[in-house]
């Protein structure tokens, strides 16, 4: 499966020690491809049939700051203030996909400011936090949601599996988020 990734990190202050490596197109393409392939190739995991069949998928990955994501959060979710990640899915249930065409998944927007704070609060790296947030956004693009604790637990477990598949693991016993 091919991945057409549109990545935008313009206007984001990149922390000095990173030199932009976490915000580079070539860093994210293989990670996202592997995650999508893991979900779409496993019949036990929920995934739209068009994604399972598509030779190519495309998505947008946008890094912004708290002000940028707060504006989107207000406009699209009617919630004030920043959040960590937003996803805007492009897939719907219409059967108008033609075999052989690329499938547009949608867009993932991440606040680097919030990601930095959360990484510090959870005592892990910004890189791990970005992978965690982007995996969460990707699962939303693939139709996953968490309206209740059971579905949230399942989604968080799959996020851990995705990160583990690309070598983003935390020390034994440490969880990326606290499940209440």
From Swiss-Prot:
It is found in: Cytoplasm. Zn(2+) binds at residues 136, 140, 146. InterPro entries: MetalPrtase_cat_dom_sf_prd (IPR023091), YbeY (IPR002036), YbeY_CS (IPR020549). Keywords: Cytoplasm, Endonuclease, Hydrolase, Metal-binding, Nuclease, Ribosome biogenesis, rRNA processing, Zinc. Its main location: cytoplasm. Binds 1 zinc ion. One of its GO terms (biological process) is rRNA processing. Its EC number is 3.1.-.-. Its cofactor is Zn(2+). Gene3D superfamilies: Metalloproteases ('zincins'), catalytic domain (3.40.390.30). This is Endoribonuclease YbeY. It comes from Synechococcus sp. (strain CC9902).
